[in-house]
Amino acid sequence: MANKIRVRYAPSPTGLLHIGNARTALFNYLYARHHGGDFVIRIEDTDRKRHVEDGERSQLENLRWLGMDWDESPETHENYRQSERLELYQRYIDQLLAEGKAYKSYVTEEELAAERERQELAGETPRYINEFIGMSETEKEAYIAEREAAGIIPTVRLAVNESGIYKWTDMVKGDIEFEGSNIGGDWVIQKKDGYPTYNFAVVIDDHDMQISHVIRGDDHIANTPKQLMVYEALGWEAPQFGHMTLIINSETGKKLSKRDTNTLQFIEDYRKKGYMSEAVFNFIALLGWNPGGEEEIFSREQLINLFDENRLSKSPAAFDQKKMDWMSNDYLKNADFESVFALCKPFLEEAGRLTDKAEKLVELYQPQLKSADEIVPLTDLFFADFPELTEAEKEVMAAETVPTVLSAFKEKLVSLSDEEFTRDTIFPQIKAVQKETGIKGKNLFMPIRIAVSGEMHGPELPDTIYLLGKEKSVQHIDNMLAKL
């Protein structure tokens, strides 16, 4: 095994980059960069049935958007896709066959299904039973000849050491061990189509690429003993393994599911909605790891410097969409205006709102944004029909002082000339209404805000009125007075 730390992220090109896979990539990336090691991308594309066109491009594109870079990948190195490494796998299959550590199995899917059904009915744990048990060499040869004559294509199975103990000290969970007798019998390392199974190919790849540490989700724990068997059969040293805990939905407490519609689970979704990649990177980094302390906002460089594998959580990581949005808002409101406007611009353009007021509108709503696509509904006031009031807003407008406030403020606006109507002259007009009527606080400001914008909350009221314009503001107030 290499002395230098070398880790890998090895996705299957079967769809979009999920938040769980993004976390796996990110933790490997942070670990490598913190220790001055190598971060390798390898594509595991041996499951041809689930292969999605453009799946590989999508994975790499979204990793790059998150801000990760890598030292080796299919983009720069040959044979970094499993489909390009079939000769290498075959070489080791042949070696294990020659050494008697693996054998060709001619049992059919129908026979396997029937045996599983028998075992389940008998209350036995399903397992593969070697089809050659009890056969003499002559009987074995006759059986193989008969099966091959019938056109049955064999798989290749690894001969499992039933008395073996397969254990490792996990980077996250500590000591874990499995008994060879609980693995389910001899298992397939090469399918009928000639492709290796995952648990075989991944060992060959990790050894060939000198991977020193394998950091992945704890759904892979059950795969680890099988992989250790292959390392043992080939006489190789295994890497260190670390299995991160599940990601659960913070609302349900259950494993995060693609059916959870209250969460954005694919990195592509965050890109399309105009989240800042730095915010998503920061949020994912804290799913099952934290550096200690109360601080939660970290740059990529800070996260690399702070990353400590000993602080990986042993408890499930809670995915909280509200926290993601809080963090995203923190990034957006503190980002430089040019970056935020660049994120908002495509959404404004698509909505036909890229007017001479566009920059002012983005500046106005920047403190509220959780994602750039929100700029369109937030600016409806300036482009769309006046919104219907909510019950809470109607309750505010039912107060007996509201007509007095609105009429007085309308008069103040009308009295301003076009030159006098500026952002800085609006607040003094509101204060003048307060002085004249004796009405103050939310009884003063809330009716004006609702009458002008149709909302109880929003940006600074003078900013909203100024961007809306004197004429439209007066029109909105007149319309509201007519409804009271």
Swiss-Prot record:
NCBIfam families: gltX_bact. Signal peptide: none annotated. SUPFAM superfamilies: An anticodon-binding domain of class I aminoacyl-tRNA synthetases, Nucleotidylyl transferase. GO terms for biological process: glutamyl-tRNA aminoacylation. GO terms for molecular function: ATP binding; glutamate-tRNA ligase activity; tRNA binding; zinc ion binding. It catalyses: tRNA(Glu) + L-glutamate + ATP = L-glutamyl-tRNA(Glu) + AMP + diphosphate. It comes from the Bacteria. A motif ('HIGH' region) lies at residues 11-21. ATP binds at residue 258. This is Glutamate--tRNA ligase. Keywords: Aminoacyl-tRNA synthetase, ATP-binding, Cytoplasm, Ligase, Nucleotide-binding, Protein biosynthesis. It is found in: Cytoplasm. CDD domains: GluRS_core. A motif ('KMSKS' region) lies at residues 255-259. The gene is gltX. GO terms for cellular component: cytosol. The lineage of its organism: Bacteria, Bacillati, Bacillota, Bacilli, Lactobacillales. Monomer. Catalyzes the attachment of glutamate to tRNA(Glu) in a two-step reaction: glutamate is first activated by ATP to form Glu-AMP and then transferred to the acceptor end of tRNA(Glu). Its EC number is 6.1.1.17. InterPro entries: aa-tRNA-synth_I_cd-bd, aa-tRNA-synth_I_codon-bd_sub2, aa-tRNA-synth_I_CS, aa_tRNA-synth_I_cd-bd_sf, Glu-tRNA-ligase_bac/mito, Glu/Gln-tRNA-synth, Glu/Gln-tRNA-synth_Ib_cat-dom, GluQ/Sye. Belongs to the class-I aminoacyl-tRNA synthetase family. Glutamate--tRNA ligase type 1 subfamily.
